[in-house]
């Protein structure tokens, strides 16, 4: 069967457009039956949680803690995945009959992960059992100290082990453990927590339906942590997105009522651009505690105050982010002049460490080079956040250089580390060496990839509504990008902030288009007909919905 025949068969069987069927084929669909995985949101795709190594051990540990009424603490991370995972554990274990205390790390006071100070605080409070979420898989020394304090330790993580041995916890749940048969290696930490609780409820006879109210938190984490959209992640995220509108959780109700652009549907863009930044803002500006309190709050007056505080944090975050970005550009020129290396390492005194990761991502995108943004603290310790560009692997680059870090961790595309300020120049040299080992070369004139060539007449509101069937869009399920040829440009206007607005015209079809931060395209657009690369989005203005093209580039 040719692709043309397959797209026709998919369109006919599932009553969708040929264009949507073509997108499904690009997603790897090779038969009409495979298309059901994408189009039927109710098609189950969950793996048996008991396939996860050490699941029985973990259940026995918390069951014994409940039986003996032990004091249990949940300790997470300061990003949304750690916050959501902590909320799921605190809420669902409490529902199960095991009340827990919780604590989160603070970027500005102790940094990432478990610390000696934190352990001492929990010991002084009488902690007997510690559950780590979104952290712990590399915390060998810290868990050793917890065990010496007499605590039992359960680790729920989704990061890869360091390769230097596992911590001596009582039980570790992590899909990346050696010999772990759990098929989905792409779970976020909140997803690991959910699977653990699913197994716990199943084993102890508590209704599994009681867990469904926590699924929106799994959706938030899966999208915010940018984990690959595997089949199970797709299923769990969709279930969670569908629960926003009828949740009995006050926080989810508020997020839905105030931040969902379409009250009939919570989409991935609502989470990516509205909900996740709001919930991450408290940890970036002060303490993540505000976000966790918000997610767990059951008092209507208190939750309003918490939401207002989160909104204030988010406003502050935007301003600080813009300020640091401008300073980073200036500092870049001071360090390197016009001769940029393959890896950018940009340091400055006491930048806000909560937003350096956002700035690093923006710089990496702008300069097409992996970038580490480093905030040098008054005590001489420098705190860094790094983001990748192209094929550069941060984890592979940092691992051979771990001798110069006070602490470090990360993935292929992102990393963080603490380093003594006097070693920053050495870091610059060694990162260039690692770029050479990896064969990384910045591609300054990157071609803009697109999925399909279309005519503008195919891009209408019916298609955009139909496109929601492929939600949620994220890692390994990206929002489709289109190419339309011979587009006439009409009514071009330059806007403040370096944006361009115009009408894209092809035949009898005219659609509003905007190019964000792309004033450099103005000359190309003024020349006449262009081949336009874009995303097609829905825009609602004064209650009227219309199609808007978000321009990625011109050919």
Each predicted region: which residue ranges?
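Hydrophobic helix-and-loop "lid/oligomerization" segment in the mid-to-C-terminal part
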Residues: 6-129, 148-150, 168, 202-426, ...
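Beta-strand/loop nucleic-acid-binding surfaces
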Residues: 508-524
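OB-fold single-stranded nucleic acid-binding module
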Residues: 423-430, 521, 526-555
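Beta-strand elements of well-folded, non-transmembrane domains
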Residues: 454-456, 471, 517, 536-538, ...
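A common structural junction motif
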Residues: 402-407, 433-440
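Accessory interdomain/linker segments of ATP-dependent helicases and helicase-like nucleic-acid enzymes
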Residues: 445, 452-513
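Short acidic/polar mixed-charge low-complexity motifs
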Residues: 380, 507-510, 544
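Active-site cavity-forming subdomains of large catalytic enzyme subunits
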Residues: 120-190, 194-203, 213, 230
């Amino acid at each position: 069967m040719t692709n043309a025949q397959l797209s026709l068969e998919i369109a006919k069987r599932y009553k969708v457009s040929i264009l949507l069927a073509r997108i499904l084929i690009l997603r790897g669909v090779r038969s009409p039956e495979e298309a059901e995985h994408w189009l039927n949101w109710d098609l189950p795709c969950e793996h048996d949680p008991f396939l996860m190594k050490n699941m029985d051990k973990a259940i026995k540990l918390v069951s014994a803690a409940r039986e003996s009424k032990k004091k249990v603490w949940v300790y997470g991370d300061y990003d949304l995945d750690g916050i959501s995972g902590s909320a799921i554990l605190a809420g669902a274990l409490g529902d199960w009959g095991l009340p827990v205390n919780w604590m989160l790390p603070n970027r500005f006071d102790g940094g990432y992960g478990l610390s000696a100070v934190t352990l001492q605080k929990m010991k002084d409070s009488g902690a007997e059992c510690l559950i780590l979420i979104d952290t712990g898989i590399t915390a060998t020394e810290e868990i050793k100290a917890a065990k010496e304090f007499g605590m039992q330790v359960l680790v729920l993580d989704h990061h890869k082990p360091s390769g230097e041995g596992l911590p001596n916890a009582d039980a570790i749940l992590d899909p990346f453990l050696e010999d772990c048969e759990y098929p989905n290696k792409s779970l976020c930490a909140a997803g690991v927590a959910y699977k653990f609780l699913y197994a716990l409820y199943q084993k102890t006879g508590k209704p599994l339906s009681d867990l469904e109210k926590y699924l929106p938190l799994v959706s938030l984490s899966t999208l915010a942590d940018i984990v690959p959209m595997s089949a199970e992640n797709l299923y769990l995220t969709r279930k969670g997105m569908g629960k926003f509108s009828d949740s009995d959780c006050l926080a989810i109700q508020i997020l839905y009522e105030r931040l969902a652009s379409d009250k009939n549907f919570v989409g991935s863009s609502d989470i990516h651009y509205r909900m996740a930044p709001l919930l991450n803002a408290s940890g970036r500006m002060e303490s993540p505690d505000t976000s966790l309190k918000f997610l767990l709050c059951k008092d209507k007056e208190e939750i309003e105050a918490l939401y207002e505080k989160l909104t204030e944090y988010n406003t502050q975050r935007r301003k600080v982010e813009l300020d640091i970005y401008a300073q980073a550009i200036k500092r870049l020129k001071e360090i390197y002049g016009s001769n940029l290396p393959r890896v950018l390492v940009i340091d400055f005194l006491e930048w806000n460490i909560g937003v350096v990761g956002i700035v690093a991502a923006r710089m990496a995108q702008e300069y097409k080079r992996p970038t580490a943004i480093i905030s040098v603290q008054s005590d001489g310790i420098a705190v860094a956040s790094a983001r990748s560009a192209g094929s550069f692997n941060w984890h592979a680059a940092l691992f051979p250089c771990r001798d110069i870090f006070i602490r470090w961790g990360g993935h292929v595309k992102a990393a963080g580390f603490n380093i003594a300020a006097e070693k920053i120049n050495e870091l610059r040299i060694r990162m260039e060496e690692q770029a050479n080992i990896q064969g990384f070369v910045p591609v300054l004139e990157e071609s803009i990839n697109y999925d399909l060539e279309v005519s503008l007449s195919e891009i209408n509101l019916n298609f955009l509504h139909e496109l929601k069937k492929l939600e949620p869009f994220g890692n390994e399920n990206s929002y489709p990008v289109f190419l339309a040829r011979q587009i006439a440009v009409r009514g071009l206007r330059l806007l403040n902030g370096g944006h361009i607005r115009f009408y894209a015209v092809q035949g009898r079809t005219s659609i509003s288009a905007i190019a964000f931060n792309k004033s450099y395209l103005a000359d190309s657009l003024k020349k006449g007909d262009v081949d336009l690369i874009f995303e097609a989005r829905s825009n609602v203005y004064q209650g009227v919905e219309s199609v808007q093209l978000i321009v990625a580039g011109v050919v």
